Amino acid sequence: MFMGLDGFEWWTGVVEDRTTDPLKLGRIKVRMIGLHPDKKSSEQGIRTEELLWVHPMQSLDNAAMNGIGNAPIGVVEGTWVFGFFRDKLRQDAVAMGVLPGIPEDLPNGSVGFNDPNEKYPLADKLNEPDTNRLARNDVDPDVYDESQSQTAFDNGEAPYVYRPHPIIASKRAAEEKEIPLAGYNAEGPKYDEKGTPYAAQYPYNHVRESESGHIHEIDDTEGAERLHTYHRTGTFEEIHPDGSRVTKIIGDDFEIVHKNQNVYIKGNLNITVVGDATFYCQQNVTQQIDGDLKQHVKGNVDQHVEMNVTQTVDKDVTQVVHQNVTQTVDMNVTQTVHQNVTQTVDGDVNQTVGGNVQSNVTGDYTQNISGNYTITVGGSMSESVSSSYTRSAASISDDGGGATLNLAGSAALDGTTVSLG
């Protein structure tokens, strides 16, 4: 059969079924003007179930092979479509496209040329074009008044009812304000979420919106060019005219990379986490900071190192502890100080040594004690002085069962009272 030689007919009609195609080819049942009555009873008309299955035509940029390309599903019950018959018996129909309009009445499912489910057209979109509101941008939601818009239409002052798309107001209302940055107090620096720069002009904003409310925009409006992907829950990604990107995720976010990931930021990086943050690296971590590192921990710091800790500080180390310091070392402690050590203790010093104590002083050793000085030796005590030995006191008393004092040089004992033995 050569199509057209035995007759060629166009048709226009309304989709009444798109969900029951057993072959799932995107076929639709269409009630056609002039061919089918608007009555749907078996006695006087044609029921929706008895209408032809109409094949959808797809564009040449769609493969329509093995699932490659866009699926031919997009029309809804109540959509006006047009096409042609491929046979003179009017049994093989093809749908070429859809016909938008301005719906005026709610659907009546009992009458043909209507959505049998009585859903489309929606009640809140009557008396306005089928063109998406984001593409039209008739009115700013901040100044929109439904009654005024309806009155203007009723009085013939407007060609249709102007209504804004609800996501503009919802996105503006949900913008995050005064997000705190890291600082030492609540009055530290803050920043705001960058608001949507939506300023579309008809006919430059190319919009695709699904039935549930998912949206994709390619806005070519001069000076307001955007890319926008929006999920019905409020999750979105929007690229602004200046190339900035805003991503907001209403639910959880998972990013899984099976190989490497590289992030290069030429400016600053700010991260604010309202809840907890967990970082787990199963191998090594290398950090290089060319400037300063500041940390402010309002709670506790708990570190557990299973191996060694090595710190190299090229300059000074300053620590200020306002309360107590407790250290427990299970093995040895070795300290090497190449210059001086200065300790100032305002209270007492208590040392308990389970083994021996040995001090080696190359230079002088001086002790200044303003109070009493008591030495208790459980065993023997030996003093060896290579040069002079001088003791000066108001009273000196050496008492013991046996005392030995060996002097290599001179010795001087001076006091008001000196008692030996």
From Swiss-Prot:
Tail-associated protein of the baseplate hub that is essential for viral DNA ejection. Involved in the tail assembly. Its main location: virion. One of its GO terms (biological process) is viral tail assembly. Gene3D superfamilies: 3.10.450.190, Nucleic acid-binding protein domain (2.40.50.260). It comes from Vibrio phage KVP40 (isolate Vibrio parahaemolyticus/Japan/Matsuzaki/1991). Signal peptide: none annotated. InterPro entries: Gp5_OB_N, Gp5_Vgr_C. Homotrimer. Interacts with gp27 trimer. Keywords: Late protein, Viral baseplate protein, Viral genome ejection through host cell envelope, Viral penetration into host cytoplasm, Viral release from host cell, Viral tail assembly, Viral tail protein, Virion, Virus entry into host cell. This is Protein Gp5. It holds the Pfam family Gp5_OB. One of its GO terms (cellular component) is virus tail, baseplate.
